[in-house]
Structures are given as structure tokens and as C-alpha cells.
């Protein structure tokens, strides 16, 4: 058992795979288990989960830096990006980074039947290339290797008329950034936000030119949720809640147990902790510091050597990806270096 930033974690030594699956605080796991136990005993009621959904939504808004009425709930990044892709005009042009995580790029590529084209370019060139495109979509931090996009360049591109869609899945939770200026921000909860799989959020700019249609309109997106269960007419919320999907209840229970805590932490201290460990590994491997919590190691036999040392990472794009979160320690970094040096 470890204690980090005031919470206990039952995370094993050498676990460096938050970029794949985040490990929740013990209290969050207990909250989900209690919810499942209520369900098993027939003690759960649908409305019981509304406070958890609201708490997670509010904390996500805080983390991104937007008003809560700009936030919708979903189940995955790809379905939320799909709403945006479907809103592009026929023949629209989209720019993405080379090797981008496909939950960001595939929904746009699937619109080829309407003449939408998706162009790849190097991550470092996105800001320069973006003007002239209808939309640029990119992860704030790249999943494969932890590189960070130049947000200032993208913000300048937006001023020229290009819509900007950001996936914060690999950044939110360790990288403090205010993203209220983007047209849309999507984020899955099960990595750095330490939530169960099945919860994601979408923050939308109400003055954006994105003409989103609530294709997954449901009772939970209603103006008054519990008065929107039966019958027409359509009566959706006036806020971003109109884009809500029905909540995966227990995922939101977990989110409510962890996100308010994350949102209340000293975010600069969290970043310094995570990046400090990652850069210590880079330095020990004669790699330059990168200012990222993710390290990609592409060396012969690295996967076998790390596995033998009890290090848990992921193989991504031909390299072993190691990710350092707030529950990791200097001992985890030392375990990597002992195995590889």
C-alpha cells in the first residue's frame, strides 16, 4: 500500500502503465465496490447515481478550466469525437498528427463517404499547417511517446478560423493546462484521471462554429432528466448536457470518488512529481529531458529486461512506454534504471 497526495493506493512496485490503465485510490475502488454491492442486493435506484454524475462533471470542468454547463458526459473518446466529425460540412478538411491515436483520427476518416479528407503531418508542424483547414484534431500529449503539442500555436491557428479539437486523455491529471479556448476538449477517464473504464467527457465552446447535432440524444440529455423519459416533443437541455449519453453508473461512482480530489490538488506539484521521475529515467538512459510524464524506450531486449525486473509498461509503436503518475516513486524509476543500465 502506498500513500500519495493524501490518498492510499494498492499499486504494485514497478507499475508504470498509467498511460494504459490508471490505478484508482483505494477509496474510489471501495466506492465502486459498494455501488456494485447495492446493485447486487437490489438496493440501487437510478436516481441514486445523479449526484455522482454531477460531481464528476463539475470536477472535470474545473480541471479543464471551463464552466460546468459546457460539459457533456459520454462513454469513450471516439463516440464524442464522432459527434464532432459528423458535424463537419461535406468536403471538409481535417489535419491530424502523424501516428495520432485512432480514437481521434478514425471518426474523421470515417466521414470520407461525405468527401471529408484527413491529412497527417508531423506533430511539430500542426500549428503552422493548421490555417486553411476546417479543423485540427490532436492529443495534447501523444499516447505513443509522450510528446506534447504546441498549444500556443494551435490557439493562434484557431484565431485564423480553424476549429481546434483536443484530446486530453494522456495529459489531464498530470499536466496543468487551461483548455477553455479550444472548440472542443474530449477526455477518457480511465488513464490519468484514475476512473473506471466507461466514462468520458466533452467540453464544448458555446460560441464555436462547430454545429454539433446531439445524435445520441436520450432521456439523460433532457432539459429535466426525470421528465424526459417518455414521449415527444424533443426537449433537450439548453447547455452542453444536450450531448449527454446515458451514464454508465458505476463508472461515474468511481469518477465522483476521485475527480474532486484530483481537481483540488496542487497541479504544479503533481506535474513536478510525475515529470521529475520520468526525466530521472531519461537522464539515466542518456536521453534528453522532455518535460513529459511518459517515456518511450526503444532499445534491444528492453521489454524482456523490464518484465524480468517486475516493471509493468506497454509496448506502443515499437517502443516500451513507461508512464509515471502521482503514486509512483523514485524506487520505481530506480527499478527501471537497474534493469536497463
What are these regions (language model features)?
Residues 1-341:
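Pyridoxal 5′-phosphate
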Amino acid at each position: 500500500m502506498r500513500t500519495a497526495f493524501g490518498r492510499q493506493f494498492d499499486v504494485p512496485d514497478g507499475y508504470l502503465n498509467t498511460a494504459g490503465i490508471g490505478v484508482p485510490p483505494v477509496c474510489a475502488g471501495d466506492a465502486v465496490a459498494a455501488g456494485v454491492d447495492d446493485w447486487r442486493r437490489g438496493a440501487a435506484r437510478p436516481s441514486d447515481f445523479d449526484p455522482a454524475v454531477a460531481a464528476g462533471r463539475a470536477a472535470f470542468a474545473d480541471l479543464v478550466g471551463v464552466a460546468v454547463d459546457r460539459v457533456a458526459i459520454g462513454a469513450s473518446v471516439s463516440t464524442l469525437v464522432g459527434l464532432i466529425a459528423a458535424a463537419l460540412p461535406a468536403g471538409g478538411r481535417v489535419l491530424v498528427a502523424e501516428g495520432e491515436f485512432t480514437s481521434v483520427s478514425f471518426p474523421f476518416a470515417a466521414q470520407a463517404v461525405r468527401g471529408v479528407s484527413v491529412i497527417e503531418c508531423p506533430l511539430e508542424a500542426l500549428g503552422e499547417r493548421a490555417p486553411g483547414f476546417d479543423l485540427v484534431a490532436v492529443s495534447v500529449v501523444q499516447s505513443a511517446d509522450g510528446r506534447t503539442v504546441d498549444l500556443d500555436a494551435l490557439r493562434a491557428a484557431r484565431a485564423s478560423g480553424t476549429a481546434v479539437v483536443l484530446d486530453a486523455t494522456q495529459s489531464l491529471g498530470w499536466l496543468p493546462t487551461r483548455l477553455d479556448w479550444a472548440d472542443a476538449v474530449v477526455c477518457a477517464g480511465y488513464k490519468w484521471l484514475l476512473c473506471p473504464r466507461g466514462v468520458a467527457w466533452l467540453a464544448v465552446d458555446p460560441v464555436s462554429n462547430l454545429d454539433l447535432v446531439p445524435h445520441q440524444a436520450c432521456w439523460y440529455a433532457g432539459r429535466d432528466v426525470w421528465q424526459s423519459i417518455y414521449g415527444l416533443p424533443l426537449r433537450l437541455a439548453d447547455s452542453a448536457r444536450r450531448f449527454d449519453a446515458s451514464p454508465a453508473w458505476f463508472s461515474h461512482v468511481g469518477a465522483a470518488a476521485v475527480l474532486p480530489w484530483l481537481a483540488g490538488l496542487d497541479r504544479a506539484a503533481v506535474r513536478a512529481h510525475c515529470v521529475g521521475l520520468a526525466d530521472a529515467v531519461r537522464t539515466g538512459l542518456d536521453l534528453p529531458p522532455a518535460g513529459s510524464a511518459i517515456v518511450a524506450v526503444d532499445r534491444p531486449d528492453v521489454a524482456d529486461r523490464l518484465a524480468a525486473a517486475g516493471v509493468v509498461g506497454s509496448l506502443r509503436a515499437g517502443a516500451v512506454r513507461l508512464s509515471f503518475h502521482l503514486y509512483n516513486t523514485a524506487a520505481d524509476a530506480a527499478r527501471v534504471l537497474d534493469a536497463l543500465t
